[in-house]
Amino acid sequence: MSALETQNLGMVPVVIEQSGRGERAYDIYSRLLRERVIFLVGPVNDQTANLVVAQLLFLESENPDKDISLYINSPGGSVSAGLSIFDTMQFIKPDVSTLCMGIAASMGAFLLAAGAKGKRFALPNSRVMIHQPSGGAQGQATDIEIQAREILKLRESLNGILAERTGQPLEKIRADSERDYFMSAEEATGYGLIDKVIAQRA
C-alpha cells in the first residue's frame, strides 16, 4: 500500500518535530525514510515497485556508503515489478538489509532473500513462502504458447537466483517451489532465505 493510499484511509500517523526554527510535520514513512528505512507493505505491483526503487535511489544519492533497511510485509505480486526492485537493490552501492515482519510470500520472499548476505532478518512469528510464478494466459492458442514459454523462462531465472541466494541446489528449489512452500522464521533461516531471526534490537 502506498503512502497516498494509506493517507486516503486516514491511517498515516504524523510526527511533529521541534527545532530552533519552529515545528515541522512529517508523515511517519517520510520520517523513517530519513532514518534510511523503506517499507514494502502489501502487494508488489508497478506502483509499489516505483516507490521502493525511487526511495532506494534517493537514499543512495544521500549517502552511498550507509546501509538501507527494507522492511517487508507482503503477499507477493508482479514478477516484473519485483525484479525491478531486486535489480535496483543489486545495482546501488549501499548494502540493503531486509527484515520480514508478518509475511514475505512469493515475490516478497524473493526480495527478502535479495538482501545483503549476513543482513537478512525476520521477526520470530514471521512466515515466509516460496512458489513458482503464476500466469493468467489468455487469447489465441499461439498467444498462450508464447506466454507459457515466457513464464517457464521466468521460473528458471527466479529459481536460479534463489539457488544462488540460499545456497540450496537448483533441483531442491525447483521441487520446493512447485507448490506453496511455507516456512517459519527459523525454517527460513535453515533454508538460507534469511540469515538470522531477531526478537529484539541489539
Curated annotation (Swiss-Prot):
<feature type="active site" description="Nucleophile">
    <location>
        <position position="106"/>
    </location>
</feature>
<dbReference type="InterPro" id="IPR033135">
    <property type="entry name" value="ClpP_His_AS"/>
</dbReference>
<keyword id="KW-0378">Hydrolase</keyword>
<comment type="similarity">
    <text>Belongs to the peptidase S14 family.</text>
</comment>
<dbReference type="GO" id="GO:0004252">
    <property type="term" value="F:serine-type endopeptidase activity"/>
</dbReference>
<dbReference type="Pfam" id="PF00574">
    <property type="entry name" value="CLP_protease"/>
</dbReference>
<keyword id="KW-0645">Protease</keyword>
<dbReference type="GO" id="GO:0006515">
    <property type="term" value="P:protein quality control for misfolded or incompletely synthesized proteins"/>
</dbReference>
<keyword id="KW-0720">Serine protease</keyword>
<dbReference type="InterPro" id="IPR001907">
    <property type="entry name" value="ClpP"/>
</dbReference>
<comment type="function">
    <text>Cleaves peptides in various proteins in a process that requires ATP hydrolysis. Has a chymotrypsin-like activity. Plays a major role in the degradation of misfolded proteins.</text>
</comment>
<dbReference type="GO" id="GO:0009368">
    <property type="term" value="C:endopeptidase Clp complex"/>
</dbReference>
<feature type="active site">
    <location>
        <position position="131"/>
    </location>
</feature>
<protein>
    <recommendedName>
        <fullName>ATP-dependent Clp protease proteolytic subunit</fullName>
        <ecNumber>3.4.21.92</ecNumber>
    </recommendedName>
</protein>
<keyword id="KW-0963">Cytoplasm</keyword>
<dbReference type="GO" id="GO:0051117">
    <property type="term" value="F:ATPase binding"/>
</dbReference>
<comment type="subunit">
    <text>Fourteen ClpP subunits assemble into 2 heptameric rings which stack back to back to give a disk-like structure with a central cavity, resembling the structure of eukaryotic proteasomes.</text>
</comment>
<dbReference type="InterPro" id="IPR029045">
    <property type="entry name" value="ClpP/crotonase-like_dom_sf"/>
</dbReference>
<dbReference type="GO" id="GO:0004176">
    <property type="term" value="F:ATP-dependent peptidase activity"/>
</dbReference>
<dbReference type="GO" id="GO:0005737">
    <property type="term" value="C:cytoplasm"/>
</dbReference>
<dbReference type="InterPro" id="IPR023562">
    <property type="entry name" value="ClpP/TepA"/>
</dbReference>
<dbReference type="InterPro" id="IPR018215">
    <property type="entry name" value="ClpP_Ser_AS"/>
</dbReference>
